[in-house]
Amino acid sequence: MADSTDEVTAVPRMMVDIETLGLEPGSAILSIGAVQFTEDGLEEEFYAEVSLESCQEAGLEIDADTLEWWLGQDDEVTGILTGGDDLTHVLDEFRLWFPDDAEVWANSPSFDCEHLGVAFDAVGMSEPWAFYDERDVRTLKSLPGAANVEMEGNEHDALDDAKHQARFVVETLQNLDSAARTGVDA
């Protein structure tokens, strides 16, 4: 019989991060970054940039203040504003990549998962996770034993952010597990 730790680690864990042109659900999505992770580290990655035109055609909106903020960023970051693939194609590819019955982690699900849910609805698809599989990185940040993980890559790059958040979760869960095994406060 498997112990509860084996059962928990058997569930695929996916970290998701998006970049958008607005803070409200229904905003245009610029990019989706995601990475599968286990207690041992990062695994498969997903990254796609989304065409703003296809977002608008699907009914997603562009917030002028957020667009202005993006235009004030480094050239390396603002390149995301042009090009990209069709929203429907990107979301379909994401659904195909996303494993069944996986936990979806985000910082925070009320932003990333909700925005993605609205985008999936806009193109007539359902998101590839159930609401009860959403996990919040912010909860772990508030716990004793939360890891201090240095950012690698670029902030506001959806894949770099997803990988950073996943590394944080992996290290924090390792810290908490170690503390539980030794009976010491993390």
Where are these regions (language model features)?
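Hydrophobic positions within alpha-helical membrane elements
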Residues: G22-E24, K141, A166
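Substrate-recognition/cap helix-loop segment adjacent to the acidic, metal-dependent catalytic center
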Residues: R95, S110-F131
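Residue-level signal for well-ordered alpha-helical scaffold segments within enzymatic catalytic domains
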Residues: I80, E93-L96, E114, V118, ...
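Anionic group-transfer/hydrolysis microenvironments
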Residues: E19-L21, V35, S108-P109, E114, ...
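Conserved non-catalytic scaffold segment of RNase H-like nuclease domains
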Residues: A2-M14, E19-A106, E152
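Acidic, Mg2+-coordinating catalytic module of metal-dependent nucleases/exonucleases
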Residues: E103-P109, E114-H115, A146-A186
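Short, flexible loop segments at boundaries between secondary-structure elements
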Residues: P128-N148
